[in-house]
Regions:
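N-terminal activation segment of mature serine protease catalytic domains
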Residues: 20-64, 73
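Conserved active-site neighborhood of the chymotrypsin/trypsin-like protease fold
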Residues: 56-129, 134-138, 153-156, 166
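Active-site region of chymotrypsin-like
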Residues: 30-39, 104-111, 136-189
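Conserved beta-strand and immediately adjacent loop positions that scaffold enzyme active sites
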Residues: 34-36, 51, 73-75, 97, ...
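C-terminal segment of classical bacterial N-terminal signal peptides
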Residues: 14-20
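Sec-dependent N-terminal signal peptides
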Residues: 4-14
Length: 189
């Protein structure tokens, strides 16, 4: 029994080591651009929590619009645990559940994700980077299942991976480490 347990444990450790070795090189740097969003309502009571990510080094960020509904104020908490206030809403679209806002950054610049220079094609490998304060290189890998174009220049992607609740509003990245989408729940979810 001990031999089976030891063998199973060893295999699990090898699988973890292998998956860590397979992480793209850009994951460590990119994960620092992902943060947690906390919105507050009346009497400074927590209203919602979720995720977001920086798209510019001067504090412009994206998240899902529904987090901010009814909020009096909001803060973001970066991967190092530093809390920064949301200072302005730059744009919002409740139909597509996306919000663009500016954060009052506490340093000269923050880590930001670069936008994709080309739209990924069906079958392309993609990665979702969840928010984490840990130094791990975790991500979720998948592929583009469907890429639908709308409004002549935008794309809506369906991915063949299981989206956990904690992954909503996290960046979806190309193999080159460029962000091309904001993870959202399926409309049927």
């Amino acid at each position: 029994m001990k031999k089976k347990f030891f063998l199973l444990s060893a295999l699990c450790l090898l699988e973890v080591q292998w998956s860590m070795a397979q992480a793209p090189k850009w994951v460590d740097k990119a994960k620092r651009a992902v943060f947690s969003v906390i919105t507050y309502g009346e009497n400074d009571k927590i209203l919602n929590t979720g995720n977001g990510f920086f798209v510019t080094e001067d504090g412009v960020a994206l998240s899902d619009c529904s987090l901010f509904e009814g909020a009096q104020r909001a803060v973001v908490v970066n991967s190092e645990g530093v809390q920064m206030p949301v200072v302005s809403i730059m744009g919002a679209n409740d139909m597509y559940d996306v919000i663009k806002f500016r954060v009052g950054i506490s340093t000269k610049k923050v880590p930001a994700l670069n936008p994709a220079t080309a739209a990924p094609t069906v079958g392309a490998n993609v990665y979702i980077l969840p928010y984490s304060t840990q130094k791990d290189r975790s991500y979720t890998a998948g592929q583009v299942k469907v890429a639908d174009e709308f409004s002549g220049k935008y794309h809506y992607y369906t991915l063949n991976l299981r989206l956990k609740d904690k992954m909503v509003s996290c960046p979806v990245m190309t193999e080159e480490g460029q962000v091309f989408a904001l993870a959202q729940k399926s409309s049927g979810a």
